[in-house]
Curated annotation (Swiss-Prot):
Stated name of the protein: Large ribosomal subunit protein uL3
UniProt superkingdom: Bacteria
Summary of subunit composition and partner proteins: Part of the 50S ribosomal subunit. Forms a cluster with proteins L14 and L19.
PANTHER family: 50S RIBOSOMAL PROTEIN L3, LARGE RIBOSOMAL SUBUNIT PROTEIN UL3C
GO molecular function, one term: rRNA binding
GO biological process: translation
Alphabetized UniProt keyword annotations: Ribonucleoprotein, Ribosomal protein, RNA-binding, rRNA-binding
Similarity comment text for this entry: Belongs to the universal ribosomal protein uL3 family.
Pfam family, one: Ribosomal_L3
Cited function: One of the primary rRNA binding proteins, it binds directly near the 3'-end of the 23S rRNA, where it nucleates assembly of the 50S subunit.
GO cellular component: cytosolic large ribosomal subunit
């Protein structure tokens, strides 16, 4: 589906038409430049590769420099492919946040905040005896048994244990578009999206 690359600026809130305070996320969406056009005849599928944010030539590998020169654009820091664009695009074309003027809902793909190695309480919601907050023992926050002994003599896959939390690719669907500020390439989306401030996200129609 068509979309854009963007950068998460942060969260704020706006007032709706009926006076309610609505939390929203501000995204700097684009402008993105077409760096490659893939066709069914040549590549086996139709898609458009977009580049976002300039970077210095000295920080770009030679193969990528050749890729950008063929497109006639400056080196880009982030690249992503999108399919099913309604209009025919050519190398070097610029796509702005105005493509979301007619969009009511979008999907956002981002990388969730990395939390490092976490236990079962934070990672899986273990802990406690019911909703007790006082009087419970620390052992109530432990994972408990992870399997039998001589049979099956192993830990089954999917057993909920401590481990790395966050840092995953996350897609949030059907987020409402509250406002498009084309002059500043800003997109206001209702609610939160994955990632920290300054992280790169993909917005799809």
């Amino acid at each position: 589906m068509p979309g854009l690359l963007g950068k998460k600026i942060g969260m704020t809130s706006v007032f709706s038409a009926d006076g309610k305070n609505v939390p929203c996320t501000v995204i700097e969406a684009g402008p993105c430049v077409v760096t490659q056009v893939k066709t069914v005849e040549k590549d086996g599928y139709a898609a458009v590769q977009l580049g976002f944010q300039d970077k210095k030539e000295k920080h770009t590998t030679k193969p990528l420099m050749g890729h950008f020169k063929r497109a006639g654009v400056t080196p880009k820091r982030h690249l992503a492919e999108f399919k099913e664009f309604e209009t025919e695009l050519n190398l070097g074309d610029t796509i702005t946040v105005e493509m979301f003027n007619d969009a009511t809902f979008v999907d956002v793909v981002g990388t969730s905040k990395g939390k490092g190695f976490q236990g079962v309480v934070k990672r899986h919601g273990f802990g406690g005896v019911g909703q007790a907050t006082h009087g419970q023992h620390n052992r109530a926050r432990k994972p408990g048994s992870i399997g039998a002994c001589s049979y099956p003599a192993k830990v089954f896959k999917g057993m909920r244990m401590g481990g790395q939390l966050g840092g995953d690719r996350v897609t949030v669907q059907n987020l409402q578009v509250l406002k498009v500020i084309a002059d500043h390439n800003l997109l206001l989306i209702k609610g939160s999206i994955p990632g920290c401030k300054g992280s790169i996200v993909i917005i799809e129609k």
